[in-house]
Amino acid sequence: VDSTALLLGETGVGKDEIARFIHQNSGRSDRRFVPINCGAITESLFESELFGHEGHAFTGAGSNAKPGLLEAADHGTLFLDEVGELSLNMQTKLLHVLQNRSFIRVGGNESVRVDIRVIAATNCDLEEMVRQKRFREDLYYRLNVIPIHIPPLRERKNDIIPLAQHFLDYYNQKYDFHRKLSPATCFALLNYRWEGNVRQLKNTIEQATIITDTDLIQPESLPMNVAGSEPVQEVPAEAGLNEMLERMELRYLQTFYERYGSIRKAAERLKLPPTTFLRHW
């Protein structure tokens, strides 16, 4: 499948990572993945960045021609992040490329053909923007061939600990640490709402990895709003310390068991003996 995909979801859910994953598992994986943040580029620069320009095409352009991002993505994937931020004028120019698979460099006369796959992403409600005449309907249908809805992290509870462990592995390698997440820390991570989604979780794990002074990351190393996120009903006031820790550990192990589907795989991922799981079942 080489169709255009539209990734839909809140800011921070990991749309850019998913776009890269799609590219890396496509027939174009040996070619370039070229991202462009549509919300960070001004309309005056849009054409020259996307289409490139000929020498002396405008003031300050220089004497040499400069290929744009479309040519850089030829035979590869162009990722249009925050596509809902494009002005109507920019939308029209993008639509022309998608329809004709060709463009003209700024200051040029010859049409340049490209073979690209387009993946777009947005946190906007494009259907509502179409109704409000703020987004072109024809462009919307061009982009929305394969819509992929990415739920917020708070609706994917079973992903929180595996993602946290993934980020911890990354930062352990980056900083040459051997950090681990304590059951109490996992309990706090599971019960936080993560309004900033995967991006916030990644930043939280990096911060905790750096500031903790032991290899076992405790809630005290988390931001205060995350560390204090345990719901009261999860740990009754009458519960003793041992019971509370048992509940935390059980919740921690259950999360990995549900994620990997077997005690053996979950134990291998956590580098624990299977008996640690069995004594809770």
Regions found by a protein language model. Name each.
Residues 5, 26-31, 107-117, 124-229, ...:
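Nucleotide-binding/hydrolysis machinery
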Residues 92, 96, 104, 275-279:
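Base-recognition residues in the alpha-helical recognition helix of bacterial helix-turn-helix
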Residues 236-281:
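Bacterial C-terminal helix-turn-helix
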